[in-house]
Regions:
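A domain-start/cap signature at the N-terminus of enzymes
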Residues: 4-62, 74-80, 85-88, 116-120, ...
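Active-site glycine-rich loops that stabilize anionic/oxyanionic intermediates
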Residues: 60, 67-72, 264-265
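Structural cue for short, hydrophobic secondary-structure segments
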Residues: 65-68, 95, 260
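Serine-hydrolase catalytic-loop signature spanning alpha/beta hydrolases and amidase-signature enzymes
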Residues: 68-72, 77, 101
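Cap/lid segment of the alpha/beta-hydrolase catalytic domain
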Residues: 97-119
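Alpha/beta-hydrolase active-site loop
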Residues: 113-135, 156
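Alpha/beta-hydrolase fold nucleophile elbow
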Residues: 136-148
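Short beta-strand/loop motif that positions the catalytic acidic residue
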Residues: 192-194, 198
């Protein structure tokens, strides 16, 4: 009998190990990447999309789009559908991979800690360097955007890599970086999307899902971003379309536009559907990626900045 008391835990541990390996294997099959580099001592991976129309003699915009927590590059490609815009407008699009299992971006943490955002900031900077060496990337037109945790990371890049990122966008962003840690060399133009019924990152702020992690009110956060970008305090309303309303902050050093999706969930407006039972409603009254690209085109880095 005593032997079974010893064997049963060992059998359970063995089964757990097998299930873990199977999960990792399945994850790798569904998480294709086609590029890698070593950054800060870590092997980092990414999924790159270069349209057939790419001309190496023409400086080409680079769009960096970042997946959410527990997601991956191929998932972000399917949700955001940036590849369609790459084909239409001749963009290079890269989907970097976060770290850990589940995958995530390090968006807050003490310097030198395991959660220090600078490790991921350095990775993105190294990635820009690598792609710029391999392709004719226009340094004045490098843009970042992301979903959820990836939206939070795009904000981190605006704070820590403002000399290289021309503008940023965020969808259902989880903004955990304290404002005291955001000191960009220039105010970055920003375009933000968020649903009022987001079950993961609450529109009015509070705890993120079941994590117990406290996040700011999104309207208040955007107001503070606009204030820091030197905008007038009172924004102007944009024309409403279906369940989407928007405001544009005026006379900014870095333009800020904020779209609110009434009853919208934790999803990418106009993009691929995510399970409604988990994320809530996905609006198709606005195409977040296309709207971002229209915004980004108006905001290249100036000659003094790149």
């Amino acid at each position: 009998m005593n032997k079974w008391f010893i064997r049963i835990p060992l059998i359970l541990l063995g089964l757990l190990a097998v299930l873990t390996l199977l999960a990792i294997g399945a994850f790798r099959i569904t998480n294709p990447t086609n590029g890698s580099l070593v950054s800060s001592g870590e092997t980092r991976r990414y999924l790159l999309y270069v349209p057939e129309s790419y001309d190496p003699t023409v400086p080409t915009p680079l769009v960096i789009t970042l997946h959410g927590f527990a997601q991956w590059p191929a998932n972000q490609a399917g949700v955001s559908q940036w590849n369609d815009l790459a084909d239409e407008y001749g963009l290079i699009v890269v989907y970097p991979a976060g770290t850990g299992f589940p995958m995530r971006w390090r968006t807050s943490g003490a310097p030198g800690s395991a959660a220090d955002p600078m490790q991921d900031v350095t990775f993105i900077s190294d990635l820009i360097n690598k792609l710029s060496a391999e392709y004719n990337v226009d340094p004045a037109r490098v843009y970042a955007n992301g979903l959820s945790n990836g939206g939070g990371m795009s904000f981190v890049l605006s704070c820590k890599l403002s000399e290289r990122i021309a503008a940023f966008g965020s969808v259902a962003g989880a903004y955990s970086l304290p404002w005291s840690d955001c000191n960009p060399s220039r105010p970055l133009p920003a375009i933000v999307f968020h649903g009022t019924a987001d079950p993961i990152v609450p529109y009015q702020g509070g705890l993120a899902g079941r994590s117990g992690f406290s996040l700011p009110s999104i309207p208040d956060w955007v107001d503070e971003l606009a204030r820091r970008n030197g905008c007038d305090a009172a924004p102007q309303d944009l024309e409403a379309t279906g369940d989407v309303s928007g405001v544009q902050y005026m006379n900014c050093a870095g333009e800020v536009i904020f779209y609110t999706i009434a009853e919208g969930g934790h999803s990418w407006p106009g993009g691929g559907y995510l399970p409604k039972i988990i994320v809530g409603n996905t609006s198709h009254d606005i195409d977040a990626s296309r709207t971002m690209w229209e915004f980004f085109q108006k905001h290249p880095l100036s000659g003094e900045e790149n």
